[in-house]
Design a protein with these regions (language model features):
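Structural motif marking the loop-to-transmembrane transition
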Residues: 1-2, 29, 53, 57, ...
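A structural signal for short, hydrophobic/glycine-enriched beta-strand patches
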Residues: 73-254
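Lipid-exposed faces of alpha-helical membrane segments in multi-pass integral membrane proteins
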Residues: 6-12, 64-70, 74, 253, ...
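Membrane-embedded alpha-helical segments of integral membrane proteins
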Residues: 1-47
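A transmembrane-helix-recognition feature enriched in membrane-embedded lipid enzymes
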Residues: 252-268
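Transmembrane alpha-helices and immediately adjacent membrane-cytoplasm interface residues
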Residues: 41-85
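Transmembrane helix-loop junctions in multipass membrane proteins, especially transporters and channels
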Residues: 22, 80-84, 266-267
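Basic, gly/Ser/Thr/Pro-rich low-complexity segments located predominantly at protein N termini
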Residues: 12, 19, 103, 138-139, ...
Length: 268
């Protein structure tokens, strides 16, 4: 009965996810798969009690199911522990990771990120914003749409760098770092001072390490930070935007699969 109830709940939640997150995303149907799994597990017990299948087969299936649940729980805890208590002030650069720019949609991940960026810049006006994101499935360049939103909200366009080539979290961070390095090199060249020979000995001071913030939704912080560290980011801090309450469980599940994929590929 318990497994049957879990199956019903997964089916109901899956329907909510599809209506809120969209019909076209295949991953939004994952909760129907879980509903089927719970129903199947319940049937498995009945088959065993009726002596139609051996005990080892039931134990094997339930062990795999338990392992899956444990992976999800451990990943969710890691995500929760990665969230910052406060935003690091005075960052040199703030990378806003791109996502689908569905700004008119209620509970938009993108809007949450951009509104958080505006809040941060209001408190730290000298920070340079780096918007990262290439062409999405809808044909729109994520970073361009996101930058336009910030400009409409009063952010100085000269305070925004736009990266348009990336298509995933890892590429976001690779191309954003390259853009930051190029921007910093251009600034350094434009401010170099010619030293007159008779001014005496000059000591060259090393450049101050750049402090970089990575802004994304709360469920995405853990993976983004792990990727950044793998790529060699040093002075890096998380800046967390909120996410929708109703879809949060779905986002955690989706992120669990993404973390496992990135771990398998060696990205984290």
């Amino acid at each position: 009965m318990f497994l049957f109830i879990l199956g019903i709940l997964c089916g109901i939640y899956g329907t909510v996810v599809i209506f809120m997150a969209g019909f076209l995303e295949l991953q939004n149907y994952i909760w129907y798969v879980f509903a089927f799994v719970f129903f199947a597990l319940g049937k498995l017990i009945k088959f065993y009690l009726n002596k139609r299948i051996p005990l080892w087969s039931v134990v094997s299936v339930y062990t795999l199911a338990t392992l899956g649940v444990l992976i999800f729980v451990v990943t969710s805890i890691a995500i929760s522990l990665s969230l910052p208590n406060n935003d690091e002030p005075g960052l040199d650069f703030l990378i806003v990771l791109g996502t689908k720019p569905d700004l008119e949609k209620k509970g938009s991940e993108c809007k949450y990120r951009l509104d958080k960026a505006i809040e941060y810049i209001d408190n730290n006006p000298d920070t340079i914003i780096v918007i990262s994101g290439g062409i999405g499935r809808d044909g729109k360049t994520e970073s361009v749409v996101m930058a336009d939103y910030l400009i409409q909200k009063g952010i100085d366009r000269n305070n925004i760098l736009v990266e348009t080539q990336s298509h995933n979290t890892r590429e976001n961070l690779i191309y954003s770092k390259a853009l930051i390095d190029k921007y910093s090199a251009d600034i350094k060249r434009s401010t170099d001072i010619t030293i007159i020979n008779d001014m005496g000995p000059v000591l060259e001071v090393e450049d101050k390490p750049q402090t970089i913030g990575i802004l994304t939704n709360d469920f995405h912080i853990f993976r983004a930070m792990q990727v950044a560290k793998k790529l060699g980011y040093t002075q890096v801090s998380p800046v967390s935007a909120k996410s929708g309450n109703i879809l949060y469980l779905h986002m955690l599940l989706r992120e669990t699969f993404a973390i496992l994929k990135y771990k398998f590929l060696g990205y984290i």
